[in-house]
Amino acid sequence: LNALAAVVMRWSAGIPAESENMIRIQADRVIRESRRQTAAVQSSGGIAVLPLYGVVTQRGNMVDDVSGPGSTSTQQFSSALRQLIADDTVGQILIDIDSPGGSVYGVAELADEIQSARAQKPVIAVANSLAASAAYWIGCSASEFYVTPGGEVGSIGVWQAHQDYSKALEDAGVKTTLISAGRFKVEGNPYSPLDADAQSFMQSRVDDYYAAFTKAVARGRGVPISQVREGMGQGRVLGADAALAQNMVDGIATLDDVIKKMRRNARQLSKPGATRLRQARDALALL
């Protein structure tokens, strides 16, 4: 998010991007496109791989061309998910996650959409290798959630920052006058210290989003909200073994391992007389 903010500030100042940065952005785009094509190749045998890479924002695609392909738009992801649900040639969906999280906007809606989608087709997620914050919210909404052996998941929490530039501006000889209508319109502005009322309100908004986050995790992982808040939901990112011990994931496996498991499940389900017991045994293979 800081990187996106830096791009916006550079735009507003009319400063062009440095040539070295543009070269790096193009190189990153090639790498990510290669990874997406690899995922597309895996989309055989009725398994569609849906990538979720980079910072999560509601409309991250808007700055993709100038800040690098380092974001996922929840709107575009939802659209792609709907298309796969409607595609009769797709029997299972695998979400390939490598994301530090991002903005809260659009995440709850996407998580709800995944919950609805899994009632129609299996939706499996794998942290490959990071699913933190908003990305964990999304991943834990899947039917099953895995993490790679060297991967990490977590950062269940919400934060917001206020920066007070008043002293720096004063030292620079700059005085800012805000002209507004509405009692709280300029509350929390960066040109004056944050007062107690504004901080209390900002904290209440953070608490509201945290409540929604922990509720979604509890639903996705099938545990009480209290277990989330008192354990996995305290903001830390955990490695694979610790995450499995905390019931944050269903197993530890590479992307290829998960795809193999999904193919086995598809073959078993296609056989006459496939039983729930056999399906349960297959599900335990990665634990």
Roles of regions detected by a PLM:
Residues L1-L287:
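N-terminal organellar transit peptides
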